């Protein structure tokens, strides 16, 4: 069904509609015809059954009237033998009766023809005599096979009264050949038959002589029909049949029914013929509709075929979006063509906008790649300078450690000098010598501290360079974020990377400012140390002069030495603090270097994303270029 064309589907639908319509018509008409025909068959069977029973009734009543006439003649003439011979021996009786007879109350039996009866034959013991002597009128027995002739006969008998006294019973045996001829004449052209049955179910006359005097159950072992007035349909096991029962009226003692049996197939043969004709007509109509609708549908489907070709040209051809369908009608196909043109117009406009956007996206991606390359270069320079700062700070730490060691040695020597001064005047010269050495050490310390001060100044300049680089990185990240915002949805990922770079640059700038602040504090401490060392040198020179002048100043010198010792301890403490600061700066510089490396990695990923974006933009331009706009 999916592989059928639309035209074939329309033809199939039309054929199905016709088939369904004819099928419904056939079913409904078949039902109505069946009901009508069934009613007609029932009516005809009932009429035929009534006519048949009337014929049987007329035949039987005529015989009964003959018997009654004979009995009346016997009653008038008397029951003596001559009178009986004259009354019963009439030719009319012998023509209609197989046997005519009279049985008197004295037991005398007279019949025509005489027949062969035993000498002790007594009619009063016979069933017909007993049934008739007490009956108000003529009685009719059930048919039976006569022993003398072997034919199917029945007996009619009527009481004979003389002066209202029973004189005997007149009777006659009647052959049922005439009734059988009436019944067997109804063969319905070989499609049915008739039979005579009693109300008790005994078959009296039947075309099949084997069933005569048998019960109806033997004729219909399956679905035995109920003997009652009316028409019924049964399935005898051989074929469905219609059977009608009509009672024989007019004779009270003859409770008989005429049964008419008709084959259903023959009764409803007209329906089969009509059904065959209707199916043939349906096939002819379907073929005519297919032959007429085929060319008509092909003509009506031309606009749809044109739209299909136009769509294939757009899909499989050069993608020419400038073509439009010609609208030649205002029906559904015209509306469909107009909708198709409107759809192509919208696609045309969208493709033009996509082409423009793809070109802009390619340009933006190219610029972002250039900016990312520049940022990569700046980041490499920043990493190199950060390594230089780290090396300088390591040197600063080494110098601070050396100052601390010198301060410790100076403190030790001051302690020794104080001990020697306490020993006495004799060691003054040694003290002077020690003071001279101390003065030299202090001078050396001043030089070292001044060198430290100069190096911290260099560190400040390096930090200014780091701050400047961070500011430039921040500006570059800001420019990259602006360019990513212009790129729209395609630059969203790059905007996130640019924002991360800008945050790293800002954090680098903050760390550099903190380092700058620490270095300034270190420079202040170094200047204070220089001042203190200068003062110590001056005091040492005064102490040497005083030592040369007088020994009594030894105590004062000792106190001064102690002061110098305290100052040296302060210098040692300041130097240790400077060492701690330098280590902290070293940690910060290492962290800055790590962050800078992360920034380089992020820039590298950004550059890869930009290259992919540039490739996608080129692919988009290639796809858009496949359409003619």
Curated annotation (Swiss-Prot):
GO terms for cellular component: plasma membrane. Disulfide bonds: none annotated. SMART domains: HAMP (SM00304), MA (SM00283). CDD domains: HAMP, MCP_signal, PDC1_MCP_like, PDC2_MCP_like. InterPro entries: Chemotax_Me-accpt_rcpt, dCache_1, HAMP_dom, MCPsignal_dom, Sensor-like_sf, T_SNARE_dom. Keywords: Cell inner membrane, Cell membrane, Chemotaxis, Membrane, Methylation, Transducer, Transmembrane, Transmembrane helix. The chain crosses the membrane at residues 10-30, 277-297. Residues 31-276 are periplasmic. Pfam families: dCache_1, HAMP, MCPsignal. It is found in: Cell inner membrane. Gene3D superfamilies: Methyl-accepting chemotaxis protein, PAS domain. Residues 36-258 form the Cache domain. Residues 1-9, 298-629 are cytoplasmic. Residues 298-352 form the HAMP domain. It is a multi-pass membrane protein. GO terms for molecular function: transmembrane signaling receptor activity. One of its GO terms (biological process) is signal transduction. Its main location: membrane. Residues 357-593 form the Methyl-accepting transducer domain. Disruption phenotype: Mutant does not respond to L-Asp, whereas chemotaxis to D-Asp and L-Glu is significantly reduced. Mutant shows increased c-di-GMP level, a modest but significant increase in biofilm formation and reduced swarming motility. It also shows reduced virulence in tomato plants. Chemotactic-signal transducers respond to changes in the concentration of attractants and repellents in the environment, transduce a signal from the outside to the inside of the cell, and facilitate sensory adaptation through the variation of the level of methylation. PscA recognizes specifically and with high affinity L-Asp, D-Asp and L-Glu. It exerts a double function, in mediating chemotaxis to these amino acids and in modulating cyclic di-GMP (c-di-GMP) levels, causing alterations in biofilm development. Plays a key role in the infection process. PANTHER family: METHYL-ACCEPTING CHEMOTAXIS PROTEIN HLYB (PTHR32089:SF39), METHYL-ACCEPTING CHEMOTAXIS PROTEIN MCPB (PTHR32089). Belongs to the methyl-accepting chemotaxis (MCP) protein family. This is Methyl-accepting chemotaxis protein PscA. It comes from Pseudomonas syringae pv. tomato (strain ATCC BAA-871 / DC3000). The gene is pscA.
